Amino acid sequence: MQEIKRYLQLDRPQQHDFLYPLIFQEYIYALAHDRGFNRSSLLENPGYDNKSSLLIVKRLITRMYQQNHFWISSNDSNQNPFFGRNKNLYPQILSEGFAFILELPFSLRLILSLERKKKKIVKSQNLRSIHSIFPFLEDNFSHFPFVLDILIPHPIHLEILVQTLRCWVKDASSLHLLRFFLHEYWNWNSLSTPKKASSSFSKRNQRLFFFLYNSHVCEYESIFVFLRNQSSHLRSTSSGALLERIYFYGKIERLVNVFLKDFQINLCLLKDPFMHYVRYQEKSILASKGTPLFMTKWKYYLVPFWQCYFSLWFHPRRIYLNQLSKNFLEFGGYLSSVRLNASVIRSQILENSFLINNAINKFDTFVPIIPLIGSLAKAQFCNVLGYPISKLVRTDLSDSDIIDRFGRICRNLSHYHSGSSKRKSLYRIKYILRLSCARTLARKHKSTVRAFLKRLGSELLEEFLMSEEQVLSLTFPKASSTLRGVYRSRIWFLDIICLHDLVNQK
């Protein structure tokens, strides 16, 4: 990293960042492979040493500019065992390295700006978790009856993304290469819906797309920082840029800036005395104190502003005025709402006693049962009605591997949806996975589910059927006496940094 910093010379205030030559450096691709993402499919050949040579990179660029970019003959496949028959490998390798290179000016300039201002950077692993959103919603959104549910649109033209990066990167060669990538391999569906990947780009190329998407979204989100400074009574507290998370964390008294990881996972929090803003993936929520008329004015103020100054075509129907007390809010894999929680308090003064009825707003979260059953049905764990079926592709595995894979999916779902106010829907999902596992094992041994479990015993599924109480008792052995009460309440785990698509579980 020091070598990259010396090359860019970002400490000079008006230094142009010539990033294009970095594409030909071997260590760039080594660093891109070591940033926590599973790229083992690129390295299936044991003879490959996890690096790209200068000659290979030059050949990749040459092949991409040829007429048939993705065509590989059988002779070439036999001569080069590393590339094989993967038609997406050429743009895939360059895309990974190019995304890593584009992130350098953002991260390094952020470090330098914080160092100049002598701000203390606090690294907090808890803020990385997706679950950290929901305590924020519980503390603030329960007081707001109306929120704006916003579906973030895509830029109307690809050139807008290039123009956005021109403010950060002054290297014309890199921008030309970026423009080539966008027009040749771009697919917007792969951004908003990762499971609908482009035919020319696999899911390994989402890093470049998410980086461009978040850099563009951060541009129009800057309006909230401006509005916050205009409306806040504490204008002395400065506010920084809203960037992605992992390296840099700074917390100010009236403002929370969450810097997320490598522009990969979309999450921004902005805390203001009058306005609250949350974004996750392609959806954002804006809440403010006021009447429905006031929120409607916000809607018709922001839409023309974003369209005129940021070229974002916000259709009015993509911004909904949601009353949380009557409608559910779909956000972050949960269905959320605000309901009145009535409680009766008995008070006694001397010889007189009386009852006080108290009602407070409570922010509830529920498991979206229909979308989850749809995902399980697409992954062939059940049919569209939720009836468990056997998983044919796993019948060739050992019994322990089958139980482990089903159990891992069940534990991941239970882990993420542990914040649900009601567990009935979660129990149904776990029942589908358990019975699907039993049917898969019975089909492998050519038996019925009842006969199979009776012959081998229920201890075969002991690890798979482990309850949350047992998991918590293993995690917190000293607090076993109070686990029963904790289990009934919602639990937010601050170690969840990504979601796994069930459809891709094999």
Curated annotation (Swiss-Prot):
| Cellular component per GO, a single term | chloroplast
* GO molecular function per UniProt: RNA binding
Q: Which residues form a coiled coil?
A: none
Spell out the subcellular localization from the entry: Plastid, Chloroplast
Q: Which GO terms describe its biological process?
A: mRNA processing; RNA splicing; tRNA processing
Q: Which family does it belong to?
A: Belongs to the intron maturase 2 family. MatK subfamily.
- The molecule here is called Maturase K
| Provenance organism | Jasminum nudiflorum
